[in-house]
């Protein structure tokens, strides 16, 4: 390109020189055809064209054309001027063709550069959008994964908590069930024990070791009976002393004074019975009052009282059976002896027996009217006094028989007296053992009564203070 523009400038100096130079573009074209120049980028070509500019070439072109007519005028004398002009024209035409060719090449390159720029500008936001979309998709995927992990963790935690709660509930239920079973077994134990006690009263009657069982049962009785027992012992001793004296007198004296002595013996137990009844009347009254106070002031003790009553019921039942069964043989003996005795003796004895029970009946009526709950205790204690009367009757009958038989039957009477005394001693021993066995329960009840009285006093003091 640069050679093509500079060659026409050297033409005015020598005519032949420019001719040679004019011919040179053919060689240049051939060389360019052989060695194709590397096409610059579209953007570079566009900038070079702007920098160089086409009007400069156009300005330089007319200069050789203007100079050529002058040269022709000056060198008309030289041979072959026409040929030279033709060559110049040809060279000019070639130059114009080359310029046109270059312009044609440059014109399509300019829009290509613009297209590249436009494409790049269009592609950049698309690439950015794609990149943003990819980032958003990645973020969404990460969030979904995190949510799934959180859900799994929460589910695992919920399962763990549910398992722990179930284990805790099972751990709590197992000891509770064991405790309930133990409590039920404990409740069943006394029931079984009571059932065994109720089943074995008949067996205990046949077994000679009644004393041990009675002691075991008697450990739950009440203290107020101690005084009654002491009084009963004293009364028994008093009864035995006149009986012994009577026996001695009977051996020494005839049978005539035996009747008034028998009457005295029958009359002697009369004051004993009212004393026992008075004690019975006096002793249970505070117990009943204490029970009422416990129900009024201490409702919590109701369950304990019920349990104790349940425990005492079989014992009372056993004792009733024992007392009811013990006097049966004595009664049968007494009936036989009374039938054998003479009629006047029976009349006297009936009169004597009819007189003392009258105040006893009045007392019994009063007790039933004022204290209906204590009827069972009174019956039991009256039964205790009955064997003593039967023994007195037996002694009187024996003495009367001996008096009628005379001195021949003294040996038999002595034997009978010894046997009766032994029976009385055995009976007294049994009663003493029963009384001793009843003492510990009596003490416990007395203590409870004292505690209740203290609580009453405290409550009364509080009520007074509040008033």
Curated annotation (Swiss-Prot):
Stretches with biased composition (Basic and acidic residues): 49-75, 178-192, 220-231, 295-318, 348-373, 380-391, 415-437, 450-467
Tissue specificity field: Keratinocytes of epidermis and other stratified squamous epithelia.
Subcellular compartments: Cytoplasm
One cellular-component annotation, GO: cornified envelope
Annotated Low complexity bias: 76-95, 105-177, 278-290
UniProt region (Disordered), positions on chain: 48-467
Top-rank taxon, per record: Eukaryota
Maturation and modification: Substrate of transglutaminase. Specific glutamines or lysines are cross-linked to keratins, desmoplakin and to inter involucrin molecules.
Keyword Cell wall biogenesis/degradation (UniProt): no
Biological process terms in GO annotation: keratinization; regulation of antibacterial peptide production
Keywords: Cytoplasm, Keratinization, Repeat
Function field: Part of the insoluble cornified cell envelope (CE) of stratified squamous epithelia.
Subunit structure: Directly or indirectly cross-linked to cornifelin (CNFN).
Name the record gives this protein: Involucrin
